[in-house]
UniProtKB/Swiss-Prot annotation:
Signal peptide: none
Reaction it catalyzes: L-lysyl-[protein] + 3 S-adenosyl-L-methionine = N(6),N(6),N(6)-trimethyl-L-lysyl-[protein] + 3 S-adenosyl-L-homocysteine + 3 H(+)
Gene from which the chain derives: prmA
Compartments reported by the entry: Cytoplasm
Name under which the protein is recorded: Ribosomal protein L11 methyltransferase
Residues holding S-adenosyl-L-methionine: 145, 166, 188, 230
Record function comment: Methylates ribosomal protein L11.
Family as reported in the entry's similarity comment: Belongs to the methyltransferase superfamily. PrmA family.
Species annotation: Pectobacterium carotovorum subsp. carotovorum (strain PC1)
Entries under Pfam families matching the protein: PrmA
UniProt GO BP: methylation
Enzyme Commission number(s) from the entry: 2.1.1.-
């Protein structure tokens, strides 16, 4: 059915309060987006951050009297009488179908494809990972995930062990297994990521070769031929002593989730143990790779 959309510009520090008021006025959902499309990359630990200039967007049933809604919201001290707003009629669509139509098989490197389950596989002879887009974890569409997948495709993984540090959906570990790795270990702080990785590994027929751990449960003596960590620059710097010890001597390390402007700081944290390659960039993001030197 059609909907009515109400958009109100506000500041991040009162956005949630405004959202509550919109729900009380009859909205069936409220979302927030940055007015200027400025990304928030690294909130501080424990911080749920909204932008300084935020749009609160509410959806109402098509039968809603928006004059009544506006009159009710004008009673809110943070808005007041005559507050600026925008009302739009949204046409009825098959939103699920429209969402699905946006995702297509994607190729990374020479051999590797990531394919949504509802699409035909473009090349049955290629290395195909079946992975459906989700809300929280990597699917290959983000530049950092793409950089890591391309790197894995270019390695000789046959018979190797890989650690995916911050595994999310498990996409990198699963891709490595499909590319020939004998064993993969996924580590993530989020139990939902562990479950998502487990489900995706089962779908791709590699669950018997994938071990998954929360950090508190991981074995103390972990090591691997290849280690990939697609997280963020801050954790990569802070966890450098831990991550640096995971690759075996001569093993490969791949780091991403790093803005190009942050590359030097992250690389410096790993330079004492690794011979680093030139930084690879995609859009505003980069990938740092290297090989561990013998102790």
């Amino acid at each position: 059915m059609p909907w009515i959309q109400l958009k109100i510009n506000t500041s991040g520090n009162v956005a949630e309060q405004l959202g509550d008021a919109m729900i009380e006025s009859g909205a069936v959902s409220v979302t927030f987006q940055d007015t200027h499309d400025t990304p928030v990359f690294e909130p501080l630990p424990g911080e749920t951050r909204l932008w300084g200039d935020t749009d609160a967007i509410a959806l109402y049933d098509a039968e809603t009297d928006m004059n009544d809604v506006i009159a009710m919201l004008e009673q809110e001290p943070l808005l007041g009488v005559g507050f600026k707003h925008k009302i739009e009629q949204l046409e009825d669509k098959d939103w699920e179908r429209e969402w699905m139509d946006n995702f297509h098989p994607m190729q990374f490197g020479k051999r590797l494809w990531i394919c949504p389950s509802w699409r035909d596989i473009p090349d049955p002879t290629a290395v195909n990972v079946m992975l459906d887009p989700g809300l929280a974890f990597g699917t290959g569409t983000h530049p950092t995930t793409a950089l890591c997948l391309q790197w894995l495709d270019g390695l000789d993984l046959e018979g190797k062990t890989i650690i995916d540090f911050g595994c999310g959906s498990g996409i990198l570990a699963i891709a490595a297994l499909k590319l020939g790795a004998a064993r993969a270990i996924g580590i993530d702080i989020d139990p939902q990521a562990i479950q998502a990785s487990r489900d995706n590994a089962q779908r791709n027929g590699v669950s018997e070769r994938l071990e998954l751990y929360l950090p508190k449960d991981q074995p103390a003596d972990l090591s691997a031929d290849v280690v990939v960590a697609n997280i963020l620059a801050g954790p990569l710097r802070e966890l450098a002593p831990l991550i640096s010890d995971l690759p075996k001597a001569g093993g490969h390390l791949g780091l991403s989730g790093v803005l190009a402007t942050q590359a030097d700081g992250v690389a410096e944290a790993y330079a004492d143990k690794f011979t680093l390659d030139p930084v690879a960039e995609r859009e505003e993001w980069c990938r740092i790779t290297g090989q561990r030197r013998a102790s």
